[in-house]
Amino acid sequence: LLRDILKGDDPQITAVVQTIIESSPDVLIVQGFDYDLQGTALAAFAELIARDGPDYATRFALPPNAGLKTNLDMDGDGKTGGPRDAQGFGRFFGDGAMAILSRYPVVKNQVQDYSALLWRDLPAASLPVTKSGPFPSDAAQDIQRLSSHGHWVVPVETPTLGAVTLMTSHATPPVFDGPEDRNGLRNHDEIVFWDHFLAGAFAAPPVEKFVLLGDMNNDPDKGEGLKPAIRRLLDHPRLRDPLKGQPTATFDGLGDMRVDYVLPSTDWRVVASGMVRTPAASRHSLIWVDLDR
């Protein structure tokens, strides 16, 4: 990714950058962005945007589960060392991870990272089981983390609204598995995490001024994903849904689906909301919401 950013001639990167420049959000969650320890690729990406667009002085990313090796067979194919044997799918550590670009600083001493939470430690976890027992094995479930990428709670200090808490994740697609429905169950529980978080299961949830956003990889009405978790989240009494029912991505063979969400807390006033669809950049749209108090 860094090589392609620095070369400056990758058509997809050019389209992504142009979309960001034209939209000019104050805070941006970037999904599917490769992580590196020094943040070199993210810095180069932000500098590329700043040439003709907003200056994102804050570039934030935590180590993801994507590509984090386990040395176990995590997908039940009898082999180890494959991309699905990592804590989250990845051909290398940091493959297709998450990042935040912001005009405003992150309150780093208040960041909460739940990426290391074991799947089995989620309340009422829906772990995969077959006739032979836990899938793919007891040993795998003993170390399997819930997050395929991460679950972050990140306060951002704004000049006029004070601290705004971002709650973000990128759930695994509920496909590419077998009859045990490992990915479908994990997708469901990655979404259910936020319901538990807002109920205070892990720490005191934010009282006000928060936004839950990310790629949940689950449409409430279409596709293979288990629907109870995403429907419950969209109906949560502390959240509002400014883009209710609007598809956010287009998939070959499936058509338009709603899998990306920006859900502000109910104490916000939603000034406007919308999507920017740029097929050359991504099959996912850029989702935006303009908020005030």
Locate the predicted segments by residue.
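A Trp-anchored, charged/polar loop motif used as the substrate-binding/catalytic surface
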Residues: 10-14, 134-156, 189-202
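Active-site metal-binding loops of divalent metal-dependent hydrolases
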Residues: 32-33, 171, 215-217
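Extracytoplasmic/secreted cell-surface and envelope-processing proteins
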Residues: 36-42, 69-71, 175-178, 219-225
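Beta-strand-turn-beta hairpins that frame and shape the catalytic cleft
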Residues: 103-108, 145-170, 293
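Extracellular/periplasmic catalytic domains that process cell-envelope and extracellular macromolecules
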Residues: 21-22, 50-55, 91-95, 145-148, ...
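N-terminal, active-site-proximal structural segment of metallo-dependent hydrolase catalytic domains
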Residues: 1-100, 128-131, 140-142, 160-164, ...
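Active-site-proximal beta-strand elements of phosphoester/diester hydrolases
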Residues: 1-3, 111-115, 163-173
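Metal-dependent phosphoester-hydrolase catalytic domains
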Residues: 105-113, 183-211, 216-293
